[in-house]
């Protein structure tokens, strides 16, 4: 901080508190009275990794019913309190069984095409209707949280570090992925397998009889 301030910068310095935990993301449609929530996505990567660089799983794979109820309740209150008519993106953090709001964006996010495809809810079309005066309850999808389908869907980021050789591959708050793919399966493992294969990470190469290895990177305080 001393190094930053000694240069006499004029812009404010923002210091965030970091909490380890599980990040979640919600895209909702609000008309100012009712809210439609197609689904809740859970990130696999640690908290602090940019949402665009995280693997997002729908539906969440280890969130309790009580916590899901809190997420839905908070999402509805936030969307209605903002007074937004259209799309709202909300990012949460669960840490020590407490729910924290990371940020709320009254706009579309990169997860809208993903959640629209895997839930069958055309979010952009519906949000456009809401913005032009149609009520959420008249869209034909009900209100609140939509029922989860009998399958898992994962959004897997695609990186280009082999081409951007000078880029630091360590994932953090700055987005580094250059694309993303979708994997759908009857189980979470099947969806992850398909997603990772499509992203070029090739888990299929780990066939029986082949010599393989796993690289583990562990923080000093976790050793």
Listing of model-derived features with the role each one plays in the protein:
Residues 1-209, 217-222:
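ATP-dependent carboxylate activation and anion-phosphoryl transfer catalytic cores
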């Amino acid at each position: 901080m001393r190094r930053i301030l000694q240069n006499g910068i004029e812009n404010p310095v923002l210091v965030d508190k970091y909490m380890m935990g599980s990040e979640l993301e919600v895209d909702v449609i609000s008309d100012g009275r009712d809210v439609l929530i197609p689904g809740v996505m859970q990130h696999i990567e640690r908290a602090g990794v940019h949402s665009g660089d995280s693997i997002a799983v729908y539906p969440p794979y280890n969130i309790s019913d009580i916590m899901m109820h809190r997420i839905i309740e908070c999402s509805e209150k936030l969307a209605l309190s903002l007074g937004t008519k259209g799309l709202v993106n909300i990012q949460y953090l669960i840490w020590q069984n407490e729910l924290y709001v990371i940020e709320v964006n009254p706009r579309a996010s990169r997860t809208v095409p993903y959640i629209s495809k895997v839930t069958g809810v055309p979010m952009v079309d519906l949000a456009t209707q809401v913005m032009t005066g149609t009520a959420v309850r008249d869209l034909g999808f009900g209100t609140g949280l939509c029922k989860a389908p009998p399958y898992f869907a994962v959004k897997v980021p695609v990186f280009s570090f082999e081409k951007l050789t000078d880029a630091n591959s360590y994932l953090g708050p700055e987005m580094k992925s250059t694309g993303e793919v979708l994997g759908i399966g009857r189980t979470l493992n099947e969806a992850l397998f398909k997603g990772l294969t499509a992203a070029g990470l090739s888990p299929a190469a780990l066939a029986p009889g082949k010599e393989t290895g796993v690289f583990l990177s562990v923080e000093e305080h976790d050793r």
